[in-house]
Amino acid sequence: MGKKDKRWVMQRKNDFYYKLAKQNHYRSRASYKLLQLNEKFEIIYEGDNVVDLGCAPGGWLQASYDLVGEDGFVIGVDLQKVKPLREENIVAIQGDMTKKETINKIIDLMPSKADVVICDASPNISGVWEVDHSRSIELSLMALIATTHLLRKNGNFVVKVFQGSLFDQYVQLLTKYFKKVQTTKPKASRSVSAEVYVIGKKFLGKKFDKNTDFPIIKLIEDNEFLDRYIEETHEKKEGNETSDNDEDNNKNGLMIKKIKELRGKRSKL
């Protein structure tokens, strides 16, 4: 383990919410983000049916159970297999929330339509700001699309989004589907994190319309941010060609290659 990794492990172990989660047997410090969000915005109530999109490792499942109690029901889905929880009214399934068969399976397992849909999922991090933001927006859009099939009218929605150039447009998009939309960063979020939580209250019952909401999707599909990053990186590389810093030039070249590979792998919505 390198020095950087050791430092990260020590910082994590000394983190207040990490230690608190351990003490209270939560699987993740993120449990406190949901509890704080709920305290401020009153999203989840006792007896609610809750769907958790991207639920691994299960911290939000546990927090949701604490909020809904024995009369509620919580179901989570994730690409990874999630270790089962002991409570009978918490179910975790393995699946892709973007697939119709996964949505249908969730619907079949639920006693009724969801009162609340939550999503604390993060994309695979590349280390390139605009790439990660673009991926986060894609993931948040997928969560919204799934939510329009799972959530009852007047239900609530919570989703994590990374800050960036498309953030405001995503928030604006949610106003078409929810009567009230708010944004916040709970105390349990690390100050260095780019994450912001968007809360949609009172779902209007509309299905996602790709034709109506095409502008934000087109911006992602056109890879506008990746194009701009590559262009800027090329300019920096050309500016460094007269210097002796070959290491920086090599890093820039590798980053451009990495972004192009990422672009090729990205799936369309």
Curated annotation (Swiss-Prot):
Function: Specifically methylates the uridine in position 2552 of 23S rRNA at the 2'-O position of the ribose in the fully assembled 50S ribosomal subunit.
Classification lineage: Archaea, Methanobacteriati, Methanobacteriota, Methanomada group, Methanococci
Active site: 160 (proton acceptor)
Region spans: Disordered: 234-269
Organism encoding this protein: Methanococcus aeolicus (strain ATCC BAA-1280 / DSM 17508 / OCM 812 / Nankai-3)
Principal location class: cytoplasm
Classification via Pfam families: FtsJ (PF01728)
Biased composition annotated in UniProt, kind: Basic and acidic residues: 258-269
Presence of the UniProt keyword tRNA-binding in the record: no
Subcellular location field: Cytoplasm
Catalysed reactions, as listed in the record: uridine(2552) in 23S rRNA + S-adenosyl-L-methionine = 2'-O-methyluridine(2552) in 23S rRNA + S-adenosyl-L-homocysteine + H(+)
Protein name per its UniProtKB record: Ribosomal RNA large subunit methyltransferase E
InterPro entries from the UniProt entry: RNA_methyltr_RlmE (IPR050082), RNA_MeTrfase_FtsJ_dom (IPR002877), rRNA-MeTfrase_E (IPR015507), SAM-dependent_MTases_sf (IPR029063)
Keywords: Cytoplasm, Methyltransferase, rRNA processing, S-adenosyl-L-methionine, Transferase
Enzyme Commission numbers on file: 2.1.1.166
GO cellular component: cytoplasm
Transmembrane spans: none
Positions of disulphide bridges: none
Residues the entry annotates as binding S-adenosyl-L-methionine: 58, 60, 78, 96, 120
Enzyme superclass (EC): transferase
Similarity comment: Belongs to the class I-like SAM-binding methyltransferase superfamily. RNA methyltransferase RlmE family.
Gene Ontology molecular-function annotations: rRNA (uridine-2'-O-)-methyltransferase activity
